[in-house]
Amino acid sequence: MIIAIQTLIFFRQSLLTALDRLLRPYFQKFALSLTKSSFESDDDEPDENVFAEYDDEKGVIFFPPMYVQRYAAIVDCLLDERWSGKLDKVVDLGYHDMSFIKYLKEVSGIKSILGVDLETIPLQCSSDLLSCNEYAPKRETPLQISLLQGNAADPDYRLIGCDAVIAIEMIEHMLPHDLERLVHTVFAFIKPWIVIFTTPNDFKDVITGDINICKFNEKYLHRLNCTTLQVKKFSKTTQGLMAKNKVDALVHTREVVEEIKHLTKMLNFNKSGLNQQDEKTHIWYNFNWGENAPYWNQYYKIVREYNYPFETKSDDCRILDLISDEMNRLIDLQYDDILSVDLNKLEIPLQHLMQTVQHITDDVENVRELLEWNGYEVVDDMVIYSRLAIDNVTIDSQIDDWQENESVSDVKKFN
């Protein structure tokens, strides 16, 4: 009986290894198909983890927090196909603790970010969050972040050339006479491609044609830091601009935004005629200025500036880096033991890898030739990634290192 048990224990590992060799390829294909379908379903289906609930003491509680959902909605606007990758310079008015600039600097294509705030203490306390020391990973494109102190209504010359203007929860804190100056500074002085204002006020739906776009319910007045006169003043000033600008409604996929539509609304003023503009010609250009901009308009004070290190790479190098990172991610997802020589191959659909480089190219044949030229095996639109050679080299190198260390220790011991 004991001999039989020992025999079963001896052959158990061999049996499991054989079954793993037979079933692992089918499991990998099935897992990759599930992974691919999950990526595709993320854009189509709403996130079930986004919801809101009511608490008797705290009121409405949002998951994730409301400011995170608002930031996500603004980023969705900036990633619109009409100007995605074309926004070189962006200004965030009233950024306070720089919580949104941390998201803004990850948007592709942006090379310059301006932060303007009237308060000095939050600027000095929060500016260390954007530290870019020598240990930070290098970016693909240059990025400069400038923190400025001043009134957002002042037409400072550094605002010239901004492609996007963002003001999050700011207009309800401004004085009535500054609101009118702000509108003229944004739409008459800067003249960006896109302007985004957010406010906790209960706006009427812009698409319905109601001109009182900033009218809100009286029961929410005690929660705001502004008066009815301030909001109506801003609304009255913007009414004259609606005839010259195309107003788009922000359609957000998250259901919670629809449920709390009476609490928050975003105005996205898209300057008409964007497609007709020459990309090489600045929209802010005024022929009365000539070639020199009015640099005498120095209203803001520089608090701090950051220049992030960057490394210029070719498109082929960027494609290879992104594909390599995606392969490593899938390998770490599939393999439990990276040193196992039994799990020696992984087949990755080429179409799945194209999703990671779609912002660079959509030429499948070019990517296929690039992978084959760099040593990857592509068979029937499947990239064959083998780790057998890598694992053998790793194991052998470790054994050699151990042997060398043992020999050296022996020599030292006997000497």
UniProtKB/Swiss-Prot annotation:
It catalyses: small RNA 3'-end nucleotide + S-adenosyl-L-methionine = small RNA 3'-end 2'-O-methylnucleotide + S-adenosyl-L-homocysteine + H(+). Its main location: cytoplasm. Transmembrane segments: none annotated. Mg(2+) binds at residues 169, 172-173. S-adenosyl-L-methionine binds at residues 99, 117. Binds 1 Mg(2+) ion per subunit. Methyltransferase that adds a 2'-O-methyl group at the 3'-end of piRNAs, a class of 24 to 30 nucleotide RNAs that are generated by a Dicer-independent mechanism and are primarily derived from transposons and other repeated sequence elements. This probably protects the 3'-end of piRNAs from uridylation activity and subsequent degradation. Stabilization of piRNAs is essential for gametogenesis. Its cofactor is Mg(2+). It comes from the Eukaryota. Its EC number is 2.1.1.386. GO terms for cellular component: cytoplasm; nucleus. It comes from Bombyx mori. One of its GO terms (molecular function) is metal ion binding. Belongs to the methyltransferase superfamily. HEN1 family. GO terms for biological process: piRNA processing; RNA methylation; siRNA processing. Keywords: Cytoplasm, Magnesium, Metal-binding, Methyltransferase, RNA-binding, RNA-mediated gene silencing, S-adenosyl-L-methionine, Transferase. This is Small RNA 2'-O-methyltransferase. It is found in: Cytoplasm. Disulfide bonds: none annotated.
